[in-house]
Amino acid sequence: SDDDFTRGQSFYDLMIKADPANPNVAYVGGIDLFRTDNGGNASGSSNPWTQISHWYGMSGLQFAHADQHSSVISSVDANKILFGNDGGIFYSNNQGTNLGSRNYNYHTSQYYTIAVAPSTMFENHSVTQRGTDRSVNRSSSVFISRTGPNQDVFVGGLQDNGTMFQADRGNAKTRAVDVSGGDGAASMFSQNVNNKYYITNYVYNRAVEAVNLNGDTSRTWRLNSEGSTNGDFITVQDLDSNRGVVYSNYRSGGTNR
């Protein structure tokens, strides 16, 4: 059914590809990826489709980013296949048994919002921001340590690719960590250097969070959690750092705080 593997999004994320050398082998994708080895023919109560990925890697399944759109099977070696999704390109050389990202050193993300910390906020202050390195889908962190001013630290909400936190190291290349999965929406950094925190949100007003950086390790508090569609998909929000108040577009004709 539509709700099974596309979860109501078949207008957006739906692909199918048959192996040109063996049409009994086929791949379908919605949110995640599935493969059949018998042409999708059910035998009794058994499911002819095997799930080969999960959008954040759970239940023993390997990670492949959500929302599948396309795939290409090699005309020379049908074991080799590329999958295109909202996270870029994923590759397998054994019919999807093992998948790996092919986006290393490519920065193709699109920012909805971005928030920058005051340049002196982390002067003489060290803190570790925990998160996930999405290039390998493993836990990672950003360590901020500076004995002088002008540390560039920012956070931003990305289309389909979470909320990324990053800090500079002079002219050296740095990598961001994802601090909130799914779609990244509003991001707001406190402009009070004596109160180090930032605000993030998922879509609508579903997961508004505050991340405290005053200690030596980041700590996250959920300010609002709901399953509704109050506000816009990428809703307008703003932070008054002086009062510690978040304002949000929450419903037609009204604003909540």
Regions found by a protein language model. Name each.
Residues 1-257:
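Beta-propeller blade termini and top-face loops
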